[in-house]
Amino acid sequence: MGKPGISLENVKYNNKSEILKMLQKNGAMSRKDIAVHMGLTPAAVTLLCNAMIEENIIVEKGELQEEKRAGRRKVLVDINYDCKYIVSVSIEAVDTWITVTNIKGGDLASTKIATDTIKSPEDFLKDLTKEIKILLWEQELQLNELLGIGICIPGIVNRKKGISIHAYGIWDDEVEVGKVVSEYMQCPVIVENNVKAFAEGEMLYGAGKSGDNMLFIKWGPGVGSAIVIGNELYEGYQHNAAEIGHYIVEPNGIKCRCGRHGCLETRVSISALAERLKNEYSEERTPQLYKLTNGDKEKITRQLITEWAEVGEEGYFAQMDPAVENVMSGAVERMARVAVNVMTILAPEHTIVFGPMLENTHIYKLFMEYCREYDEHYTDEYIHRSKLSKKISYIGGTALIARTYFFENGGISKKE
């Protein structure tokens, strides 16, 4: 028996996928322009687009005057981003965010629950699915309107199996997150490391649309990173890759939650900074901080430091006590040094930084100064702050589902 040829059905779905990716990248286009970009006949593209309109995947969106042809207008088509909805879940050590979005990453509704680490992971995940169902009910959405659920979690994740291998600060053992959630929700579930998921969000919705090889660095509450090579997330052996938070910066240093000693996180995570500031704390050495906390150093928490970072130019970081500035400058220098070392090894086209610490203008400016001190080529043209930072709690989970079950799938009909 001869080798089977390429299925015409697969060709159709591949072409649909290419159309969706093109519209996602360029916005509304005419059938004629799509045909030119894809190298297909206008008739073939018209058939594809008409089928996608019938499936409610794309919609016609007005007209555009053709150049050089008076009176002739192009009818534009664009993605119907509301044809299905996505639930994005971001599990962090303290809180878990649940957000309903459309395929474009538009936020419809969200809720926040405490990440209960006292309960078993399975019981917590059952509670999570109940909250998801409540949120969907409040939005009058049925399960069949859901494209899938994207779950982002810190630490090491086996995406293929939907398993959290080690969620630092949340669960120490393996948890079959995908299996538990999909059993209760009866829909596709993708589980991924939070930084890798955010990188997918950037590739689909942000600066990553224009670059093939990139490095992503997150600071706050811990330190995370992800590598994109050839527009694909790089995954190393045993699902480890670019764990710069666990780069050794202090031999025989403080024990890290990963089990090693002297990791970058032990010096610069927000929890580590809170402990170091407590050690510096006194009315004489830190008068402003002393006044701010009413003489109670136990008020120096991860939440307080995060609030300082989020306030911006008017916050405490802009007018720190000298002793506090010493601590913060040391942390920023370490972050910059490790970032420069990683950029030197990987030589990405761009580095995108995000997270509450690097969103703060004062901290980011200092970070860039240290980067340029080590290498003058590391300017704002090479290192960018993410424009999606305000969507950090959901854009990664949305991208996981949208990319896999919509853009790579030629829409929704193949799965259904």
Q: Which residues fall in each region the model found?
A:
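ATP-binding/phosphotransfer module of carbohydrate and carboxylate kinases, centering on a glycine-rich
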Residues: 1-61, 66-71, 76-112, 117-137, ...
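Short, acidic, Ser/Thr-enriched surface-loop or helix-capping motifs
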Residues: 102-103, 159, 228
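Residue-level signal for well-ordered, solvent-exposed loop/turn and beta-edge residues enriched
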Residues: 106-107, 163, 232
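Glycine-rich phosphate-binding loop and adjoining helix at the ATP-binding site
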Residues: 110-213, 362-373
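Short glycine-rich anion-binding loops that position phosphate/pyrophosphate groups of nucleotides
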Residues: 154-156, 221-222, 357-358
